[in-house]
Amino acid sequence: RLAGMLNLDDTLAVASRTLMAQIDSLTQGGDVAGLTQVKRAQVTLADQLFRDNLPAPEIQALLSSINLDIYRRVVDGALAAMAAEGLGPPPVDFSVIVMGSGGRGESFLFPDQDNGFILDDYPDSEHLRIDAWFIDLGERMTRDLDAIGLPLCKGFVMATNPLWRKTLSQWKAQISLWSRKRGTTMLRLCDIFFDFKSAWGRDDLADDLRRHVAETARGNHMFLREMFEDDQDHGPAIGWFGRFITMKESDAVGYKGYLNLKHSGTLPLVEAMRLLCLREGLAINPTLERMQALEDRGILAKDEADYLRGAYRHISHLLLRQQIKDFQAGRPVTNFVHPRSLTRREADMLKNSFEAIRRLRDHMRNEFTGDVLQ
């Protein structure tokens, strides 16, 4: 199985024998207690691979792959329990989808849950019976994932919410509606949803919906323009004369002077690559793969793509390193990094990374909105 851009076996080849044995144990057992240990072992795994100089995006791909395995085992366990309780098998085929960073294969250490169900179509007359069954499954799945170490989503982006639990036809209608009746809330729902990936069940349901998303967004200039404008809150943290724009106390208590390397680092680049791929009708999720596809099509110049790849890798490296340090020191694991924790070379590279992202977004502003910066 591929873990992002790197074959899983190749990834494991750089780990010590102890870690390889630990990883092998990930395939053993599927109860909540065992999977909790699997989740906890991810920090040790990430730290060792980091020390072995594996690039951060490839560590993220491996962490995401492990999280998908956790999803599969949790769903298998929930289905077995429901069958044992006399609730029967699933009334229709379905796919469990994971969204956000998990859908892109770019999870850091402690992502929360972003999941949903795509159900095969069924008669409206059967809705109450079938939906009740999937509500039960969704409650079991999200409860167990939370117990294991994948926290409940504070924004309720979970299969327990009917907004994220629909038949394939309902999902297609929802996407078409979002593309026509635009607004801040709907645009942000699109941002969450458009990176979905099938984690369990009928992959073809997710593939069908992915094609519909690509067909709906491609050429829909007003929709893409409004998505770009809504993403403007997440800009690279670089100001005049190449100075970092750090956080205020009002942004996050106790983190004044820090950089939020997710909201002002990886996120602006992730959003830009997603938007360009939507415009081109490309059904690709991982950010680096999106960059490569856009370069292959001539949308990104070779040098520009090279700068952006370097930016993504460097920011991800700094963020993952900080999360590992915070966890090991018993501090809350966040997306915040203080500039003083960086070497001069790292800080210079980060400024160059932010500048590359800003240049891209300035160019996209002209393309998507027609606005030219003075």
Task: Label each PLM-derived region with a short phrase.
Residues 2-18:
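Short beta->alpha transition motifs characteristic of CBS
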